[in-house]
From Swiss-Prot:
Binds 1 pyruvoyl group covalently per subunit. HAMAP family: AdoMetDC_2 (MF_00465). Its EC number is 4.1.1.50. Its cofactor is pyruvate. This is S-adenosylmethionine decarboxylase proenzyme. Catalyzes the decarboxylation of S-adenosylmethionine to S-adenosylmethioninamine (dcAdoMet), the propylamine donor required for the synthesis of the polyamines spermine and spermidine from the diamine putrescine. GO terms for biological process: spermidine biosynthetic process. The keyword S-adenosyl-L-methionine applies. The lineage of its organism: Bacteria, Pseudomonadati, Pseudomonadota, Gammaproteobacteria, Enterobacterales. It comes from Erwinia tasmaniensis (strain DSM 17950 / CFBP 7177 / CIP 109463 / NCPPB 4357 / Et1/99).
Length: 267
């Protein structure tokens, strides 16, 4: 059933938080290659580029940037936090329906007392040749706008092998009759805010706690092409045995991250 538009008493006090982790997986055979991958991914997702992505996110959703704090770290990693504010807006003009959010050159929305932040975590292990890159992103808003409108754009910008997403609505707001409302928009699944092309690229599963207004979606890239996971190595340079070993190693790593548990080796 579609929710009726609420006439609120004062400001909308609901807090809506969207957080997600994206993972990029790579195989680097030698220590030099592992160091090279970490240096490459650290440069690709340095503080300046992350600031550009988050600033574009603010532009898409129509937020005013109040302050930007950014930092690159040694030996690797970066963080960016942007505080944003809302422009005057009529809540009746806000689209709260359940559908994919905008990409660049699309609809704008507005935020208040809100922030967008990202932290990156490159890592590798000397045994096995596996390297992973994780970016944690959070978009938290107060008011009538759902940060889910930014989800579509951000995942397109940070295309990765695995994505885990959490969305939660906290607090309550009152209508003019004093009745408390703990959510002000319809949502059955985070997936409903994703574009069809994104859905076709990933296997997904939901774990939702509707009565607590908590929603969780996991995404695992469907298509696997080994050449996209090798750093400074070509698949044709591998023996059939090495090709299979590395493929199995990468798939095991991706499944473990997707399911959030270690998978015992067979045999």
């Amino acid at each position: 059933m579609k929710l009726q538009k609420l006439k609120l008493h004062g400001f909308n006090n609901l807090t809506k938080s969207l957080s997600f982790c994206i993972y990029d997986i790579c195989y680097a055979n030698t220590e030099a290659e592992r160091d090279g991958y970490i240096a490459y991914i650290d440069e690709q997702y340095n503080a300046n580029r992350l600031t550009e992505i988050l600033s574009e996110t603010c532009s898409i959703i129509g937020a005013n940037v109040l302050n930007i704090a950014r930092q690159d770290y040694e030996p690797q990693g970066a963080s960016v936090t942007i505080l944003v504010s809302e422009e005057p807006i009529d809540p009746r003009d806000i689209d709260t329906s359940e559908h994919p959010g905008p990409l660049p050159n699309s609809v704008v929305a507005h935020l208040d007392k809100s922030h967008i932040c990202v932290h990156t975590y490159p890592e590798s292990h000397p045994e096995g040749g596996l390297c992973t890159f994780r970016a944690d992103i959070e978009v938290s808003t107060c008011g009538v706008i759902s940060p889910l409108k930014a989800l579509n754009y951000l995942i397109h910008q940070l295309e990765s092998d695995i994505v885990t997403i959490d969305y939660r609505v906290r607090g309550f707001t009152r209508d003019v009759n004093g009745v408390k409302h703990f959510i002000d928009h319809e949502i059955n699944s985070i997936q409903n805010f994703m574009s069809e092309d994104m859905k076709s690229m990933y296997d997904m599963m939901d774990v939702n706690v509707y009565q607590e207004n908590m929603f969780h979606t996991k995404m695992l890239l469907k298509e696997f092409d080994l050449k996209h996971y090798l750093f400074n190595t070509k698949p044709e340079d591998l023996s059939a045995q090495e090709h299979k070993r590395i493929t199995d190693l990468l798939w095991k790593e991706m499944r473990e991250i997707y399911y959030g548990r270690n998978i015992p080796a067979i045999g």
